[in-house]
Amino acid sequence: MSESPVSESAAGATYTLHQYPEKLVVASLPAGSDIPAWAESATLFSISATATETTIVCAGRSVPKKVRHEGPFTAFAVEGPLDFALTGVLHALLAPLAEAEISVFAVSTYPTDWILVPTERAAAAAEEWRRRGHTVTPAPVAATRKS
C-alpha cells in the first residue's frame, strides 16, 4: 500500500499579503465566449470557463455597463510561492473576513492565492488580517520590461 503525501498545515501560520491599487471587476459571460477587447489585462487577469459560463477578472475601467459584473474589488496576493501540499491557507485568511462579514472572491494561480474584497471594505479586511498577526503591505512595484 503506497503512502499518500503528508499535507503541511497552515494552522497558526501568519502570512504577508500584498495589496494592489488597481480596481478590478468580476464579469460573467456566456459559455464559450471569446475574450472581449474590453477585458484589459491588469495586476490580476484571470479567465475561468466552464460548460455553463465564462468568468473574467480584469481591470474595471472599460467593462461595458450592459455586461453582468461585480466590483470594484481590491486584490490582495498572498506572498508566495505556496507549496501545493500546504493546507488551510485560505481558511486562515478568509475566516477573519467571514467573521467581519466581508465578502470575498478568491482566485488561485500556480504559485499563490489572490483574495479580492469589495474596494469599500479593503481597509477593514487589512485591519482584520493585521489583528490576526498577518502583514499587509502595498504591492511591490513591478519591474518595467525593456524591449
List where the protein language model places each region.
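A generic structural motif
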Residues: 53-58, 112-118
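A cross-kingdom feature marking solvent-exposed beta-strand/loop segments within repeated
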Residues: 100-115, 121, 142-145
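Regulatory modules associated with amino-acid/nitrogen control
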Residues: 1-96, 100, 124-147
